[in-house]
């Protein structure tokens, strides 16, 4: 639907990167325990009219201080792809779906990963309510959101300039 709110910049605040790409970005930051040092990105639009206000498809590469390289992508062009895979010299793991509302499933080079079933958002809301009721800091600090936004801005800058962006 070309008139849906996700395609209106003033309502959505962004496009595919800010709505769904952030999950891949967060996964890479969480898995490495590091912030990206260099980000390179590019954007593709298959329908310039439909996606005139927001990004449709973005691919980006993040280089981390440890040498880890993460290749990520996000799109509004099609749905159903919600996987994450990490590989290294002694094995791999993958989640598919990695970002679903109805649970996560995964495998490793050594077998299946087991997760508690449940709604992720219920846990988030329970934690938020507990923090308010008990005057405690959330386990997901606001600084994490700021770090995500710094990386997102670097992705957009790389798209605009066509060059890699170094982060401090």
Predicted regions and their residues:
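Alpha-helical packing segments of well-folded alpha/beta enzyme cores
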Residues: 24, 124, 148-152
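Alpha-helical elements of Rossmann-like donor-binding domains used by nucleotide-donor carbohydrate transfer enzymes
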Residues: 26-27, 59, 127, 144, ...
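Phosphate/oxyanion-binding loops and surfaces in catalytic or ligand/nucleic-acid-binding neighborhoods
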Residues: 31-35, 89-93, 152-158
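NAD(P)-dinucleotide binding in Rossmann-like oxidoreductases
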Residues: 43-57, 62-126, 141
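Predominantly a Rossmann-like dinucleotide-binding segment in NAD(P)-dependent oxidoreductases
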Residues: 1-50, 162
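Glycine/small-residue-rich pyrophosphate-binding loop that anchors the diphosphate of NDP-sugar donors
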Residues: 16, 20, 58-60, 136
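C-terminal helix-rich "cap/oligomerization" subdomain common to oxidoreductases
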Residues: 65, 113, 130-168
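Conserved loop-to-helix N-cap of the C-terminal "lid" that shapes the substrate pocket in Rossmann-like
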Residues: 17, 21, 118, 139-146
């Amino acid at each position: 639907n070309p008139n849906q709110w996700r395609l209106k910049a003033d309502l959505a605040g962004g496009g595919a990167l800010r709505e769904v790409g952030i999950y891949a970005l967060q996964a890479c930051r969480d898995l490495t325990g590091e912030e990206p040092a260099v980000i390179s990105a590019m954007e593709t639009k298959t329908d310039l009219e439909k996606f005139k206000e927001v990004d449709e498809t973005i691919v980006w590469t993040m280089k981390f201080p440890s040498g880890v390289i993460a290749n990520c992508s996000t799109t509004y062009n099609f749905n159903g792809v919600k996987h994450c895979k990490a590989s290294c010299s002694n094995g791999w793991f993958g989640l598919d779906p990695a970002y679903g509302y109805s649970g996560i499933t995964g495998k490793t080079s050594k077998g299946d990963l087991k997760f508690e079933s449940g709604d992720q958002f219920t846990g988030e809301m329970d934690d938020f309510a507990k923090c308010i009721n008990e005057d405690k800091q959330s386990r997901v600090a606001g600084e994490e959101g700021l770090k995500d936004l710094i990386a997102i801005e670097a992705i957009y800058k790389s798209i605009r300039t066509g060059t890699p962006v170094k982060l401090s």
